[in-house]
């Protein structure tokens, strides 16, 4: 990919389905950080897109499925991919539980206990990110860092929904 292609194969806007509502302050903070980081640095290219990015992404849940609605910068629809949440459900549930433990530990535990929980949290996050990359394979090309940030947003949607 040339330098010009790399600047175009990216997301410039991410929207989460707001109809699901708000969550806890900790979850909302994770959402805001993930969106900021994702827009700052990402690699995102719908497979077989004859046009060019940059892209806008709307993430939502519909009938227990994850919806990736991709549009061009001007809002023109590119593609919508609907993925089953089943392969991610256990990871998201476990990740949510370990995040609750992590947030509780931050407030009251020793640094070594917090670090141990955080290592487990990162491991689950990596597993979820890889699963998301695998599910998007052949549909949307993303790198691992982009998958990590998208997985955070999938978790936020799931926690709200």
Curated annotation (Swiss-Prot):
Disulfide bonds: none annotated. InterPro entries: UCP032146. Belongs to the UPF0262 family. HAMAP family: UPF0262. This is UPF0262 protein mll6455.
């Amino acid at each position: 990919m040339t330098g010009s292609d790399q600047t175009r194969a990216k997301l410039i806007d991410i929207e989460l389905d707001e109809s699901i509502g708000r969550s806890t302050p900790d979850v909302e903070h994770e959402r805001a950080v993930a969106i900021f980081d994702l827009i700052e640095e990402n690699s995102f290219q719908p497979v077989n897109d004859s046009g060019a990015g940059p892209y806008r992404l709307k993430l939502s849940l519909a009938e227990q499925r994850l919806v990736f609605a991709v549009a061009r910068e001007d809002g023109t629809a590119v593609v919508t991919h609907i993925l089953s949440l089943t392969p991610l459900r256990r990871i998201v549930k476990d990740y949510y539980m370990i995040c609750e433990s992590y947030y509780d530990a931050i407030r009251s535990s020793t640094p070594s206990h917090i670090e141990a929980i955080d290592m487990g949290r990162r491991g689950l996050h990596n597993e979820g990110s890889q699963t998301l990359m695998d599910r998007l394979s052949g549909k949307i090309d993303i790198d691992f860092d982009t998958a990590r940030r998208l997985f955070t947003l999938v978790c936020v949607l799931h926690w709200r929904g």
